[in-house]
């Protein structure tokens, strides 16, 4: 039989191992982002701004390892009681699908929603694709890279206008351009990494 102290030691050991695992996943994902997603040069961003730093997460989020790591690290930041995750196509597509699968194998129910940039031009003319939950449900928005936050906020607005509650946006990378947009739209913003984390990462 275990004593109370032994039980506490086991619990503490499990937490320590879990923390180490999460940190190892973070390091691996950071290295993948630096190796596959980051470029240095002269670029025009989707916001129209010029930058010497460019990040395209798709070679990471659409890879088996990268998608699994993103799902593992992002699901812990999905708002409690969220029944779905959603985001603007195309950057958020692999993220919402990865989270939905991760949730299923973790005994949770979180569906994936894809927000179109424009309504479908035929049929039901949907702007939100997926197994849509009842109105009033909580949905967390996911994004790969945020610069001004406009893409994520577009998804937030579409979901809110469709009757869903959106309080949080979770991104892989925050370029740290402007955070005023989050407060203005009453959004809690969380990112796994800052741009400087990737720039400084050595591989």
Listing of model-derived features with the role each one plays in the protein:
Residues 1-20:
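N-terminal amphipathic/basic-hydrophobic helices that include classical n-h-c signal peptides
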Residues 17-32, 156-203:
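PRPP-dependent phosphoribosyltransferase catalytic core
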């Amino acid at each position: 039989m275990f004593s109370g102290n032994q039980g506490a030691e086991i619990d503490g050991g499990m937490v320590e191992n879990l923390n180490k695992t999460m940190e190892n996943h973070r390091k691996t994902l950071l290295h993948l982002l630096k190796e596959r997603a980051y470029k240095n040069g002269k670029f025009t961003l989707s916001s129209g701004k010029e930058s010497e730093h460019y990040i395209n997460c798709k070679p990471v989020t659409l890879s088996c390892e990268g998608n699994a790591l993103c799902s593992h690290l992002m699901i812990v930041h999905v708002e409690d009681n969220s029944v779905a995750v959603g985001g603007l196509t195309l950057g958020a597509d692999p993220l919402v699908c990865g989270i939905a699968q991760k949730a299923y194998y973790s005994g949770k129910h979180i569906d994936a929603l894809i927000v179109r940039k424009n309504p479908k031009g035929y049929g039901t003319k949907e702007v939100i694709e997926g197994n849509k939950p009842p109105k009033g449900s909580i949905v967390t928005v996911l994004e790969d890279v945020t610069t001004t936050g406009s893409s994520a906020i577009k998804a937030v607005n579409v979901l809110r206008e469709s009757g869903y509650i959106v309080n949080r946006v979770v991104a892989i990378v925050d370029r740290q351009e402007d955070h005023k947009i989050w407060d203005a739209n009453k959004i809690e913003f969380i990112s796994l990494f800052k741009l400087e984390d990737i720039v400084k990462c050595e591989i």
